[in-house]
């Protein structure tokens, strides 16, 4: 029930004119002409429509195939939608980082779980691109120039936030000063896992000083004091429930991230084989090497120690 004096809650732009629980009232013949189809609002000359709310015009006008090939539209939309999902993943990860710094773990759990679900969407998206055959891709590949997913600055920020730091990966963005500066700040900041390790220290676990004061521009490396802390958490989960849940959220996240990488490799092998990538990398062999990267090493190693 609405408290007296409170304004009515704003209506979801996707909902109809009536509340979801409003009873259906059959309309008299001829009512549709004036009341709208099933009483839905049909005139948006003075109000915001679905397309207005979502800014659909610029989004749907952002696909500009460079080749005459029919399949290029699939290629463009696959990558554009992936960038949108990455935008959401980054949005949630930044919020999770802030929550962890503030010791507000339940909201961080929700955000990290959402990122894992976003990664599942990205995994499934490869199934759509995999409908493109090698001959179809070969017809449009010359029009791509040197552009490559390797140059995705959102993907690079995602890698940096998850702890896979590499200063050389700033170079493809030197021609975009604002993006370069943003990525450099992310490179130099503590990663998600760095903040979780700081959390372990705040909760009383003896983390080595050199780990807490690490060079944030370097990739995550295994630390025995961090593994000892996680071992204590896993041996007595009820005594450290929030940290135990955090550990499992991180494992879920890396699991989903690995699946995304693996699906990327297999899709590339299926479509282009072992040709060099458009961005100059070795293509599939480079992507296979990336499968060996471990983001949260102690959380995986502790499973053997238990």
Swiss-Prot record:
Pathway: Amino-acid degradation; L-tryptophan degradation via kynurenine pathway; L-kynurenine from L-tryptophan: step 1/2. Disulfide bonds: none annotated. It holds the Pfam family Trp_dioxygenase. Binds 1 heme group per subunit. Keywords: Dioxygenase, Heme, Iron, Metal-binding, Oxidoreductase, Tryptophan catabolism. One of its GO terms (molecular function) is metal ion binding. Belongs to the tryptophan 2,3-dioxygenase family. HAMAP family: T23O. Heme-dependent dioxygenase that catalyzes the oxidative cleavage of the L-tryptophan (L-Trp) pyrrole ring and converts L-tryptophan to N-formyl-L-kynurenine. Catalyzes the oxidative cleavage of the indole moiety. Homotetramer. This is Tryptophan 2,3-dioxygenase. It comes from Burkholderia pseudomallei (strain 668). The gene is kynA.
